[in-house]
């Protein structure tokens, strides 16, 4: 599936010429794609020598449209089936509640899944499944709510349902909603899109803690150190934000990708790529990541050691699976494709669509094959789109309702045994923490924390301190943390261990003790700022920054420590990544904004970092991509954008109805997806955020503003272009020499603020005082919708808090609006345009040390 964003959620294609000649689309009808049996499909798949795929399940076993897969402690498989996903080219009836989570069991424990039940049916596109003990967490589409289900009579069908986390509705396209729900080493549960993590809290509702957004879309994975790996489709990066655990920030560094990493090498040439010609080679193969998803870090013990620790990521549009070889040098993680102009797995079957991968209890890797013709959601296959023409050209929309699960095995290994961990004692589970298969270690830790049995604390402490297996020690440490039984002496033992990875875990796990009040550990943490290992130094900087953050405030002088550690290090990696960690800022809003405005801005930042960043970048400069010219981005920059900075209605209209065509003189080949399905508050939040970020300063937009504009554009079909949007917005009327201008201070120069001369200005010469005013008399009474004051030549002299009044005779005044200035360009929009002959701006509050100035004054919607 395609997942991307374009202010806030879209996929853009950018011209990319990898060859001298450019592919020119040809939509001549072709023979419709064939539906192959699993046995026939297998013959189309290329794998490296020694590897093979085994069929585990298919539509013969009743599965349809599988999208996610996971295992419980007894090795039973749960599959989320999106049975209404794109059943025709328009995605008709997609939100009918007929999706299921199916359960599959190997009754003979031989890896042959021969018992099949519908664990839960009548669901709305179930997207996340997390087995606990005999309970299972499930989340459906269009909601953030997560319910806990239980099969109480052993028939394989859930018969109880209780709310676990109530998050409320989730609006937007189904491809731009959360996925993942993985229980990670730090005992927190993570998802994509949502800038928070959850923690099991017994029978109570979960703990919830805000975190940076990882920028993931479909799929989540963790490695042996508990670091989450995120995939990115809309930004066409493949994998990203893998430098640090996401708790500390979503960081990327130059050179983390091998030079050609983002180029892909399919076996099949069908140009059903959202990027169109710009993403297509002359042989019609995809030339670049465009739908990356379903990643997994190989952690099983029944696959070659050379593969373990590498990340596999699917590219379903390219019908391939990329292997990312992972190396760490000087604290910086690097990834590369080990196959020259080829891939780990690829197929010539057009319907080969791997959308997820997971490590299995048997030490092998499981691949979820949606097996379908059309993979993009209907929003990107609308009438007139490039993609629709290709879909119809090959009849891709006619292949649906299938699904396969494959097991990746190697000739040198036999799959391992099936587990019965749900029936094991806590003591037996402690022993499983030493298992060579990461799935067993993860599951044992999760079950121990769920049981909450502290009788095993001595055994866990012994394992953590004295095992010869570093991975066992790591899991024991975090299990103690999850049970609330971690002691400072255990943390200190890790902080001084010879293994640098264990020192890092000592820092990370020790944070929970500092947050609980044991600040004595900070002195121990500080010693690692001079550690000989770059990764340990970086972790000490991240730990210091986290503990000193405004939300925690447990490390008062953290800035001094971080600066010292960064300056003292001779490591290039510490210098590069450490500087990024140190300077990253999450601040939004502030004291210049009212409480309700700050609330909108914070919500807008959350939305932006969940959705919009994938195309516009975290810094609002546009997501950089490869192309024939340097500096190409997948979407236009938002800083200094006329649409964003201009009349407030512009960005709202763009969000509601989308945009297409050239933007700022540059052509981006796909249109912006309309976001009208989201609430007025949602639109207001993200619009206000982009208008007050990336160097922009503009009036905050309210939900009432959005409701008004939504009513105005009701019935509009199609999207805006730059030209049509500009024509639809109220005009700015420049000042005229016919205006009579006066002021409470320096009235003799008041006309300078309305002379349309950028070289002159009116200025009070004294500090702003309550009651100061500036007045304009128009030649005739006119309908005015707002005012705009520009003081670029004196940027700090803007009015901090002011009101605007109107009058027909200069004696009786009526209120037009009251607002506060934010920058050198101040805007005041009236709740409704009113007829007035006089306008008076009056300061509501004094401002010490700053005069009031106006360089250019304009009226909005002068008629």
Residue ranges and their predicted role:
Residues 416-419, 441-452, 471-485, 490-496, ...:
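Structural detector for internal amphipathic alpha-helices that build alpha-solenoid repeat scaffolds
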Residues 19, 337, 409-420, 482, ...:
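Post-cleavage N-terminal segment of exported redox proteins
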Residues 628, 632-639, 658-716:
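Axial heme c-ligation environment in periplasmic c-type cytochrome domains
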Residues 18-428, 439, 447-449:
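Beta-propeller domains with acidic blade repeats across secreted/periplasmic ectodomains
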Residues 585-609, 614, 619-626:
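Electrostatic cytochrome c docking/interface patches
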Residues 436-437, 468-469, 498-499, 532-534, ...:
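Short inter-helical turns and helix N-cap capping residues of alpha-solenoid HEAT/ARM repeat scaffolds
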Residues 748-863:
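Aromatic, loop-rich ligand-recognition surfaces of beta-strand-rich domains
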Residues 368, 405, 604-619, 672, ...:
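The canonical Cys-X-X-Cys-His
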């Amino acid at each position: 599936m395609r997942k991307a964003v374009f202010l806030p959620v879209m996929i853009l294609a950018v011209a990319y010429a990898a060859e001298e000649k450019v592919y020119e689309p040809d939509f001549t009808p072709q023979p419709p794609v064939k539906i192959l049996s699993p046995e026939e499909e297998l013959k189309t798949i290329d794998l490296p020598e020694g590897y093979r795929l085994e069929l585990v399940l298919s539509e013969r076993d009743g599965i349809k449209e599988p999208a996610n897969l996971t295992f419980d402690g007894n090795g039973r498989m749960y599959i989320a089936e999106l049975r209404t996903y794109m059943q025709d080219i328009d995605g008709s009836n997609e939100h009918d509640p007929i999706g299921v989570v199916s359960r599959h069991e190997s009754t003979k424990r031989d890896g042959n899944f021969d018992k099949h039940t519908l664990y839960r049916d009548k669901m709305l596109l179930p997207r996340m499944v997390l087995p606990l003990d005999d309970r299972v967490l499930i989340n459906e589409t269009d909601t953030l709510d997560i319910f806990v289900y239980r099969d109480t009579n052993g028939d394989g069908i859930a018969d109880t349902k209780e709310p676990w986390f109530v998050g409320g509705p989730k609006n937007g396209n189904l491809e731009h909603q959360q996925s993942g729900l993985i229980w990670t080493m730090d005992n927190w549960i993570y998802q994509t899109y949502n800038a928070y993590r959850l923690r099991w809290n017994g029978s109570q509702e979960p703990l919830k803690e805000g975190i940076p957004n990882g920028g993931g879309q479909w799929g989540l994975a963790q490695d042996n150190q508990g670091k989450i790996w995120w995939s990115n489709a809309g930004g066409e990066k493949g994998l990203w934000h893998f430098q640090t655990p996401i708790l500390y920030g979503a960081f990327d560094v130059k050179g983390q990708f091998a030079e050609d990493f983002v180029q892909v090498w399919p076996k099949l040439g069908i140009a059903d790529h959202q990027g169109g010609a710009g993403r297509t080679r002359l042989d019609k193969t995809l030339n670049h990541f465009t739908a990356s998803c379903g990643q997994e870090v190989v952690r099983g013990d029944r696959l070659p050691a050379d593969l373990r620790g590498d990340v596999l990521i699917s590219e379903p549009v390219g019908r391939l699976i990329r292997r990312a070889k992972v190396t760490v040098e000087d604290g910086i993680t690097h990834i590369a494709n080990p196959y020259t102009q080829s891939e780990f797995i690829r197929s010539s079957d057009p319907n080969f669509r791997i959308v997820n991968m997971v490590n299995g209890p048997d030490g092998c890797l499981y691949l979820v094959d949606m097996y379908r013709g059309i993979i993009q959601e209907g929003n990107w296959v609308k009438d007139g789109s490039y993609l629709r023409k290709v879909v119809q050209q090959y009849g891709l929309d006619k292949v649906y309702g299938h699904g396969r699960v494959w097991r990746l095995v190697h000739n040198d290994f036999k799959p391992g045994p099936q587990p019965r961990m749900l029936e094991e004692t806590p003591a037996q589970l402690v022993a499983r923490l030493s298992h060579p298969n990461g799935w067993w270690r993860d599951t044992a830790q999760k079950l121990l924390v769920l049981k909450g049995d502290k009788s095993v604390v001595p055994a866990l402490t012994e394992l953590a301190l004295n095992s010869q297996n570093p991975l066992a020690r790591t899991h024991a440490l975090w299990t103690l943390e999850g049970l609330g039984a971690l002691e400072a002496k255990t943390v200190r033992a890790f902080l001084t261990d010879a293994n640098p990875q264990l020192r890092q875990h000592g820092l990370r796990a020790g944070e929970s003790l500092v947050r609980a009040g044991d600040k004595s550990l900070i002195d121990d943490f500080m010693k690692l700022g001079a550690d000989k290992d770059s990764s340990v130094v970086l972790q000490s900087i991240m730990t210091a920054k986290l503990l000193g953050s405004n939300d925690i405030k447990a490390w008062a002088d953290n800035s001094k420590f971080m600066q010292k550690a960064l300056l003292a290090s001779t490591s290039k990696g510490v210098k590069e990544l450490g500087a990024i960690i140190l300077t990253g800022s999450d601040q939004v809003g502030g004291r210049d904004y009212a409480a309700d405005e700050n609330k909108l801005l914070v919500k807008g930042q959350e939305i932006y970092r969940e959705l919009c960043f994938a195309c516009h970048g975290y810094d609002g400069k546009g997501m950089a991509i490869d192309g024939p010219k340097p500096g190409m981005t997948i979407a236009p920059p938002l800083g200094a954008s006329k649409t964003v900075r201009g009349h407030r209605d512009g960005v709202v209209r763009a969000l509601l109805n989308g945009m297409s065509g050239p933007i700022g003189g540059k052509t981006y080949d796909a249109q912006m997806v309309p976001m009208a399905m989201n609430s007025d508050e949602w639109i207001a939040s993200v619009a206000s955020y982009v208008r007050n970020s990336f160097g922009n300063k503009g009036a905050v937009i309210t939900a009432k503003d959005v409701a008004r504009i939504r009513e105005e554009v009701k019935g509009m079909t199609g999207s805006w272009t730059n030209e049509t949007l500009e024509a639809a917005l109220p005009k700015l009327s420049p000042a005229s020499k016919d205006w009579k201008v006066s002021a409470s201070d320096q009235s003799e120069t008041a006309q300078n603020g309305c002379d349309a001369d950028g070289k002159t200005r009116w200025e009070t010469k004294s500090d702003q005082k309550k009651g100061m005013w500036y007045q304009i008399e128009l030649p005739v009474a006119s309908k005015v919708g707002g005012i705009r004051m520009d003081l670029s030549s004196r940027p700090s002299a803007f009015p901090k808090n002011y009101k605007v009044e109107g009058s027909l005779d200069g004696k009786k005044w009526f209120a037009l609006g009251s607002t506060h200035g934010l920058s050198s360009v101040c805007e005041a929009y009236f709740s409704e345009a009113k007829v007035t002959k006089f306008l008076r701006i009056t300061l509501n509050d004094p401002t010490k040390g700053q005069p009031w100035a106006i360089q250019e004054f304009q009226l909005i919607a002068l008629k």
